[in-house]
Amino acid sequence: MVAVGVALVVIGVVVHRVGTHWIDLALPPVVTGAIVALIGFNLAPAAKSNFEKGPVVGLVTLVLLVATLAFFRGIVGRLAIFFAVVAGYVLALILGEVDTSAIAAAPWLGLPEFQTPRFTLAVLPLFLPAVIALVGENIGHVKSVGQMTGTDVAPLTGRALAADGVATTLAGFGGGSATTTYAENIGVMAATRVYSTAAYWIAAAVAIVLSLCPKVGAAISAVPPGVLGGATIVLYGLVGVLGIRIWLTNHVDFNKPLNQMTAAIPLIIGIADFTWRVGDLTFTGIALGSIAALLVYHGMRLLSTARELIPQRGA
């Protein structure tokens, strides 16, 4: 994880220094739209699985979320997800679908458990290729945020990649898991229409404070699957729609086979969650779909260029 984080930092610095023009050439709207859409749609089975574990609670959470967004404006409307999740949690408690034993056993104060990382050079070649997929996913997230907010955040792409790398490196040194940009957060932004970075500064500070209270962590871990299923149906769906919005805004012409294939193949790979295993490393639908979008687009363009040159050589 540390090596992946360092690689992301290097890529982020290069992008920040060199600029993002080459990214626009490598990731045109049809590619970024496909990547963003497949990120959201790839997570649909997770929403379905959670929903089926508590359909009543999930349905109530989903209906309350949609109703609150439709009926209320201002602060209440922006907190629709929070209110719906809390209401679903309370209903699950009433129905006895929440295991409170871990909450009762957890202390009020305590430090998180840190682990000392072990470095194994043999596994580095397996992890570093994942950087390609992470870069594509991260850039797709940045573009979706820009599309959603109507702001040109492309110049910040390098910083986003570097920050992701720094966070992953620090997490690796502490024995934690890799960090990345999350589609769920983009879905929350789309649903609440709160785009201020100040909200994330505050959220980060609050999260650090709450991490010192194991009881809070246990309560969050005990959130019933039904509640998560109801909420993520909306959140994941919104991320998928953002990808489609990128196509519409940039007037992607789907009469062209190039654009058809670039969108169709990655979407199927992502939605079906294709997997490819190399030793102990597993590439899932999002990573494979992102790579497929790049390979299909640039591969077909290369073949089209070669086709145009062949008659000239023959002449």
Residue ranges and their predicted role:
Residues V57-T61, L79-A80, L95, P112-H141, ...:
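Hydrophobic, membrane-embedded alpha-helices of multi-pass small-molecule transporters
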Residues V2-D99, V209-P311:
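Membrane-embedded alpha-helical modules
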Residues L128-T197, R313:
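Membrane-embedded helical hairpins/re-entrant loop segments and their flanking transmembrane helices
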Residues V63-T68, L79, D99-A104, I132-T149, ...:
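Juxtamembrane interface elements at the cytosolic ends of transmembrane helices
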Residues T100-E113, Q147-G150, A160, G299-A315:
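Intrinsically disordered, low-complexity non-transmembrane regions of multi-pass membrane transporters
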Residues P29-T32, V56, Q115-L124, V153-A160, ...:
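Membrane-interfacial loop-to-helix junctions in multi-pass transporters
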Residues V4, L124-P129, A167-A171, G226-G229:
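Short alpha-helical transmembrane interface motifs in multi-pass membrane proteins
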Residues A203-V206:
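N-terminal glycine-/lysine-enriched basic segments
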